[in-house]
Amino acid sequence: SLQQADGGFAVAYGKHDGEPLFTDLKDLRPTFYGFVVAYKLLGEHKYLDAAVRGADWFVRNAVDKGAFTGVCGDARFINDFATGQAVQALLDMHGLTGEARYRDAALRTARMYATSIYTHPTPGDREIEYKGRKMQEWQISQVGLCFEHGGCAGSAVKSGPILLTSHCGMFVRLYEETADRLFLDLARAAATAREAHLAPDTHMATYYWSQFDRGPGPFPHHAWWQLGWIADYVFAEAEMRSGRRISFPRGFMTPKVGPQRIFGFEPGTVYGEQANPIMVKGLFDADNTDIEILSALTTDRNRLCLILMNSTPRKLHATLTVHPAAIPGRRIDTASAADPATGRKITPGDDGAFGITLPGYGIQTLKLDLEP
């Protein structure tokens, strides 16, 4: 095993001889998480034992000292989003073992990582011109964004923060765990109103804030990471806002990029019914892009669940039209919908559309029956 007797690892190993590299550095990263994955997949207790040794070493050497290294060898492993991964890795260790020390270490690490999230300058709504385009100041805000790597030599110095904000879903979960509003506010600041940084041709977000709307350049695989963190975030919001009456089990963290955890490996629950998330083209039309709409299908294929969430602090209204034939092999009964949170029956207007009004950061779930 590459794990050392004390539970730690070398930062890197030679490809051909297996000898440790970068021996002037310590591996202050959650490398032990690989054993968490192995234990969950294989069930052999030796992997859990190794994860415990590694996590305990990490807490002593990284968390207790407030010192972390990153994953980017081209920047001498300076601290980066691996610190965010450490939070989730320690939370997973708490879930596996029930040991309170891992939860405590996770929350301490989370508060340290929060200091690397941008909170300044505070944007306003004054009109500015940036790279030849007129816009309001908040449209290119840095608030809520994380950096690729920090310090005096990291990319944050030259390129600013990044738009790949993989911490958002985790920060929502940390708010649930701690009731510390800062986590939720930073997650929402990072996730919303980022259209100015989308590439006009691909609608993919630019990686570095400084590159504005140029897109990901030679890294198109960033699109997968964007899908991952966005999905993790919006479903985390749904889970939190519903008081966990909506819940979807997550898989493992994405390698390198951050603490996002994706779902889809097994069904979740939507107000007492097992369901799987779905994305069906042409399922519905809605007229307010500030309201997020998630969709799920119960495992018995008898109900469609639509989860509507207001992404702003203001009361909003949306008109929602559901298309009856959008799901192959089923017909959606659009004559009425049930609100499982209240037990109310909701009927559409004369035009067949549902009128939905949501308070600031509100949520409403609709369940529609499906027929063969």
What residue spans do the PLM features occupy?
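Glycine- and aromatic-rich loop/turn segments at beta-sheet edges
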Residues: 2-20, 59-77, 117-153, 198-217
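Well-ordered alpha-helical scaffold segments within catalytic/enzyme domains
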Residues: 30-45, 85-99, 154-155, 163-180, ...
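Structural signature of alpha-solenoid helical repeat scaffolds
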Residues: 19, 23-26, 43, 74, ...
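Long, well-ordered core segments of solenoidal/helical folds
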Residues: 1-10, 45-68, 104-124, 184-204, ...
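Catalytic cores of secreted or luminal carbohydrate-active enzymes
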Residues: 224-284
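Solvent-exposed beta-hairpin/edge-strand motifs
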Residues: 323-342
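C-terminal beta-strand-rich structural cap/linker in extracellular carbohydrate-active enzymes
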Residues: 229, 349-372
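Carbohydrate-binding surface patches
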Residues: 172, 272-327
